[in-house]
């Protein structure tokens, strides 16, 4: 078995005892197969040759039928490998002085596939097997004859066969045998038979040594003091094999080293190529800090999927943490098929990068790598406003105070973009998804990917229709021109959604409530405007502010551009500096300015004159919608 194969020299003793004579092992022996005598008189049954077998038989027959006998023998096994053995050897009693046609491997030089298992063979053998063969029903893989002496004693009167094992260094065998068999062996024997030894190898070589034998006329366990256990030579190692192994190992190590070196060079090359950046001339004029692409890779963990915050037509947004400062950031990466290209990218970094307002998402910097464009913003942990509009039972509902503040924050940001900064900026994509909420529940406008920059005093109109369906003003669809008034239209819809706690289009709502603007106007006309607010905030102490925002939202979302107020007027109403007149419902109902009562026109004039100062009536109507 494997643990005992660690002992290279396996030595046992064979002594043969017969009732009629004493037999000397130096008598006439026949050698077959790989068997050969060595220089010291021992018989070597097998050697380094694989899948071979050897036999040695005494040429003198012995009378054995109806007789008692004892066999004791000394042999040694030196396997090729210390952790695994070959197949083993056997002591055999045969009708002939040899077993022609025997096979190697598991057949041990005794039989072959045809002769194995036939009782007519009259072959009796004791296996000294060092490998378990399931097909022959081996009792286990701890085989006898590996590191022990073996005595085989058969008493014909008692019809008992005993097999005893004990260490080679002990001269006296133990009294208790390892195996005992009560059976009459006479039917298996002929009158005259021969005895000998066989051995075989498989895919692993082994030296099987037959060392000595003799006979005595009685059944007994003799003493072994006169037996000298020889020292067997180790299994030979061919220098050529050793050289081949050394060369193979060296070659393998050399190939591995070349492979590793090539891999390292490739990684460094691709990594360098991956993070290599080119600075264009147009980038010099823009103020925001340019981030190294490698820095963004580290911050976003190579833009892993688990860092993804969202994806839209503009591209993807990833969460990241800047190394060193541990500041949380949001990185917007434009996708290859994004609607946002270089022109929009330049517009964004040229505008928001210079803007500083508490209700605008701060642009920290940008990066450009290959075909991708990156914008780095402050991270807003509470996400976007749209998630608070979903009627999900698990979603925390906003209080009225939070809603009112969010509306004022968005209005303040738009006022800054439209009128307070040195240049007029049209956002063009105001919607709940672009209103981000920070950790203190402050609202900030983000995603300036569709923003357009114009010098103050020039015609602030564009020819490209952009935005999100549902939030696009009617005139923008007709003319394709975006103005500050189109931003006001979208803001009015957002205001109504925040107060009502729902989307402007609700397919699951009753038919008369599907379109938010129409439903609110219907409630207002029936004197139930307060019922449009979300139930969780519908408290009497909030009635005045709720109805104010609903009316203002309808005014801002009016389908006629000239009827909408500008953001300056909106902020004054929200701050209580200005009030909406009582007859505002007539203004909201009006299709256009023609045919509108004079008092209603005066209402519009009043709203817009707050923001345009000393402008004339005509200029007021022309300029409020920038």
UniProtKB/Swiss-Prot annotation:
Swiss-Prot/TrEMBL keywords: ATP-binding, Cell membrane, Glycoprotein, Kinase, Lectin, Membrane, Nucleotide-binding, Receptor, Serine/threonine-protein kinase, Signal, Transferase, Transmembrane, Transmembrane helix
Binding-site positions, ATP: 309-317, 332
Domain of life: Eukaryota
Catalyses which reaction(s): L-seryl-[protein] + ATP = O-phospho-L-seryl-[protein] + ADP + H(+); L-threonyl-[protein] + ATP = O-phospho-L-threonyl-[protein] + ADP + H(+)
Designated gene of the protein: LECRK58
Region (Legume-lectin like): 22-212
UniProt subcellular location: Cell membrane
Protein name, UniProt field: Putative L-type lectin-domain containing receptor kinase V.8
Listed EC numbers: 2.7.11.1
Classification via Pfam families: Lectin_legB (PF00139), Pkinase (PF00069)
Enzyme superclass (EC): transferase
Active site, renumbered: 429 (proton acceptor)
Sequence ranges on the Extracellular membrane side: 22-245
Residues annotated as glycosylated: 28, 59, 112, 162
Record topology, Cytoplasmic segments: 267-626
Family annotation (InterPro entries): ConA-like_dom_sf (IPR013320), Kinase-like_dom_sf (IPR011009), L-type_Lectin-RKs (IPR050528), Legume_lectin_dom (IPR001220), Prot_kinase_dom (IPR000719), Protein_kinase_ATP_BS (IPR017441), Ser/Thr_kinase_AS (IPR008271)
SUPFAM superfamilies documented for this protein: Concanavalin A-like lectins/glucanases, Protein kinase-like (PK-like)
Organism taxonomic ancestry: Eukaryota, Viridiplantae, Streptophyta, Embryophyta, Tracheophyta
């Amino acid at each position: 078995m494997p643990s005992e194969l660690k002992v290279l020299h396996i030595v046992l003793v064979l002594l043969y005892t017969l009732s009629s004579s004493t037999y000397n092992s130096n008598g006439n022996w026949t050698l077959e197969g790989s068997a050969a005598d060595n220089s010291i008189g021992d018989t070597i049954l097998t050697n380094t040759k694989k899948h071979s077998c050897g036999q040695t038989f005494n040429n003198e027959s012995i009378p054995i039928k109806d007789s008692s006998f004892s066999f004791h023998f000394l042999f040694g096994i030196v396997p090729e490998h210390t952790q695994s053995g070959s197949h083993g050897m056997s002591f055999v009693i045969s009708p002939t002085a040899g077993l022609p046609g025997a096979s190697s491997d598991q057949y041990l030089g005794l039989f072959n596939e045809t002769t194995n298992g036939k009782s007519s063979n009259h072959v009796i053998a004791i296996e000294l097997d060092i490998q378990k063969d399931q097909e022959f029903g081996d009792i286990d893989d701890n085989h006898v004859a590996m590191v022990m002496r073996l005595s085989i004693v058969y008493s014909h009167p008692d019809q008992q066969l005993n097999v005893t094992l004990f260490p080679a260094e002990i001269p006296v065998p133990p009294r208790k045998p390892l195996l005992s068999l009560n059976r009459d062996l006479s039917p298996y024997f002929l009158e005259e038979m021969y005895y000998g030894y066989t051995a075989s190898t498989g895919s692993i070589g082994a030296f099987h040594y037959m060392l000595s034998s003799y006979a005595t006329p009685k059944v007994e366990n003799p003493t072994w003091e006169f037996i000298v256990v020889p020292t067997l030579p180790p299994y030979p190692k061919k220098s050529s094999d050793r050289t081949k192994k050394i060369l193979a190992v060296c070659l393998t190590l050399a190939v591995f080293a070349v492979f590793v070196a090539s891999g390292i060079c490739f990684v460094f090359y691709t990594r360098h190529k991956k993070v290599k950046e080119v600075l264009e001339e147009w980038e010099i004029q823009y103020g925001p800090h340019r981030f190294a692409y490698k820095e963004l890779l580290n911050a976003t963990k190579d833009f892993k999927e688990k860092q993804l915050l969202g994806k839209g037509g503009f591209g993807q947004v990833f969460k990241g943490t800047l190394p060193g400062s541990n500041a949380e950031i949001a990185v917007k990466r434009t996708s290859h098929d994004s609607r946002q290209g270089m022109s929009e990218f330049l517009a964004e970094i040229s505008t928001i990068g210079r803007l500083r307002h508490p209700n605008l998402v701060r642009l920290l910097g940008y990066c450009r790598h290959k075909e991708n464009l990156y914008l780095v913003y402050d991270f807003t942990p509470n996400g976007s406003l749209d998630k608070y509009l979903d009627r999900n039972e698990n979603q925390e509902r906003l209080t009225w105070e939070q809603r009112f503040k969010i509306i004022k924050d968005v209005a303040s940001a738009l006022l800054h973009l439209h009128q307070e900064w040195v240049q007029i900026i049209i956002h063009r994509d105001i919607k709940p998804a672009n209103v981000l909420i920070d950790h203190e529940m402050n609202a900030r406008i983000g995603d300036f990917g569709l923003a357009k920059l114009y010098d103050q005093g020039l015609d602030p109109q564009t020819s490209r229709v952009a935005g999100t369906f549902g939030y696009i003003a009617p005139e923008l669809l007709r003319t394709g021109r975006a103005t500050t008034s189109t931003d006001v239209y979208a803001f009015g819809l957002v205001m109504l959604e925040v107060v009502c706690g729902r989307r402007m289009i609700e397919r699951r709502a009753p038919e008369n409530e599907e379109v938010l603007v129409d439903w609110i106007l219907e409630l207002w006309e029936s004197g139930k405007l307060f019922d449009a607010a979300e139930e969780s905030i519908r408290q009497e102490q909030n009635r005045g502010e709720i109805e104010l925002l609903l009316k203002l939202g309808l005014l801002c979302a009016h389908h006629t551009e000239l009827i909408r107020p500008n953001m300056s007027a909106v902020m004054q109403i929200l701050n209580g500096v200005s009030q909406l007149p009582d007859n505002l419902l007539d203004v909201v109902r009006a299709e256009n300015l023609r045919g509108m009562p004079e008092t209603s026109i005066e209402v519009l004039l009043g709203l817009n004159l707050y923001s345009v100062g000393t402008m004339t009536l005509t200029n007021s109507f022309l300029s409020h919608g920038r």
